[in-house]
Amino acid sequence: MIVHKVTDQFPLFLPESKTPRSPGVHMSGIIRCIATETGILKPEWAEEISLTDVRTITDPTAILRINIGLAWEQHYIGTLLEPYGVADHPSEVEIDGIFGSPDAESVSVIFTLSGRVVKHVCHEIKATYKSTKTVGDLTSQWMWLTQLKSYCKALGTRFAVLHILFLCGDYTYPIKPVREVYEIEFTQAEVNDCWNLLRDYRDQKQVEA
């Protein structure tokens, strides 16, 4: 048997976004900027940051990590969520001149004695090397929650579902992946306060520029 390592013959790259991205300021860009400035996002994970979220990522580890997340997202939504009525990347959203691209959306109809209530739900899919113990009840995950609240603001809803693939579970041996799904109902005040933070940060940076 003759074996040759030929990894370099098949270089990784980042595919185009499934949803066309409009030029301008994006929610993800603002969130990454705030997280980097406040120390929530460690410098080694920050890559290139910009309000427009137009990044030139060249680090092989970052490219591989992003590809893992994209592969899981594509399989998970298309194979496992669509049968439940979840739409894959339906469209880009915009509010106050800031753009965003939710992973998926669904609509639930709840029938009550007084009539029916239509509930619009934002879905976000993550693949992470974080431990289930670290993530816990999500309260420590500022970037994820801020992303969900900003999408909720643009979609006019307070409801979200976060689907997380913990690639290494809780890191207890033997290492095994764990999937957890969190249903979240924000208050309108939480959604509004989050959006005010992002919008005000954008406005401040544009004045400084």
Model-identified regions with their sequence ranges:
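Metal-dependent nuclease catalytic cores that hydrolyze phosphodiester bonds in DNA/RNA
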Residues: 1-122, 129, 135, 142
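Metal-dependent nuclease catalytic cores in nucleic-acid-processing enzymes
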Residues: 74-82, 139-167
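Short alpha-helical scaffold segments that flank and stabilize functional sites
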Residues: 107, 153-155, 197
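Glycine-rich loops and low-complexity Gly/Arg-rich segments
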Residues: 111, 147-150, 186-189
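A short beta-strand motif that forms part of the nucleic acid-binding face
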Residues: 126-129, 166-167
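Metal-dependent nuclease catalytic regions and adjoining charged, substrate-binding loops involved
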Residues: 135-141, 157-209
